[in-house]
Amino acid sequence: MAAAAAAALESWQAAAPRKRRSAARRPRRREAAPRGREAAPRGREAAPRGPEAEFESDSGVVLRRIWEAEKDLFISDFWSSALETINRCLTKHLEQLKAPVGTLSDIFGNLHLDSLPEESDVATDSIPREILVTGTCHLKCVCYGIGNFATCIVARNQLTFLLLLLEKCQIPRSHCWVYDPLFSQLEIEVLNTLGVTVLSENEEGKRSIRGEPTIFYMLHCGTALYNNLLWSNWSVDALSKMVIIGNSFKGLEERLLARILQKNYPYIAKILKGLEELEFPQTSQYMDIFNDTSVHWFPVQKLEQLSIDIWEFREEPDYQDCEDLEIIRNKREDPSATD
């Protein structure tokens, strides 16, 4: 994985701006083959620099920008403040899971510096990282709706936050599943190079954790995505093993009429009394990137205090009468989709 990233960055360096050739000037009959590729046989012209070669340089540019954004985020006041917010939540969450090796509060109090793991070598130079040791409690991560990070600085910063979070929690990148229906082929290849697992199907947020403690990272996603996620894990056992970093549920309650929330997003409406929420800090540098973002977790004590009737209702959401859905449906499952 590190070799692939290094190769991509070599391409980026090789693609430094050059003087444009006059349109009236005829191109050379043969060009040198790109590194790692055979030259065209004699008597046949080599193909001009095509999309694949351009992609190689473009992926290097994206990787370099991610690396630069990561360095800026890592030294920012926002990162340290947001990390403290996540710390407070995960401390309680992992204590609830009865992690065998100490508590997360002890772990945060004994941070140590280490070098980046090999899979995150996105550039030749590196900066020290604080690594968390979470004992035998192995977390997984799912990321929905990160956006077009190759072209959007907001999405790129949200991705770099995810990468730092994975590193901090010692979640292997291969144990982080990522999906956005708007990903370009370039972005999918970059994510593969970074080592995360790109999902091939639009789950619409309907992913069961299957008993595995999981952090869901889904910033600025459509409300239906959160509602679907809750439906897919609608039990005390499953919800108590989940952490959701995403749109503030309190904010949703304040913005939406109660009848709209209960009708269109019933699982969000029913879980409001069964969760705890900590808001992300707000700084001017990252105001537009992490606004309206909170960390949510589900204490067992609160979940068990909810009415039994709440757990018996498990009808799958369909949103047929919901306006302004704000998510892209899976066409194979969407009854309104046409061939």
UniProtKB/Swiss-Prot annotation:
A GO BP annotation: heme biosynthetic process
Pfam families: SRR1 (PF07985)
Induction: Up-regulated by hemin and 5-aminolevulinic acid.
Ligase listed as a keyword: no
UniProt signal peptide: none
Compositional bias ranges of the Basic residues kind: 17-29
This protein's UniProt keywords: Biological rhythms, Cytoplasm, Heme biosynthesis, Repeat
Residue span of region Disordered: 1-54
Biased composition (Basic and acidic residues): 30-47
Cellular component, GO annotation: cytoplasm; nucleus
Subcellular location: Cytoplasm
Sequence repeat copies, ranges: 30-36, 37-43, 44-50
PANTHER family membership: SRR1-LIKE PROTEIN
Function, as annotated: Plays a role in the regulation of heme biosynthesis and in the regulation of the expression of core clock genes.
Protein family membership: Belongs to the SRR1 family.
Name of the protein this chain belongs to: SRR1-like protein
Lineage: Eukaryota, Metazoa, Chordata, Craniata, Vertebrata
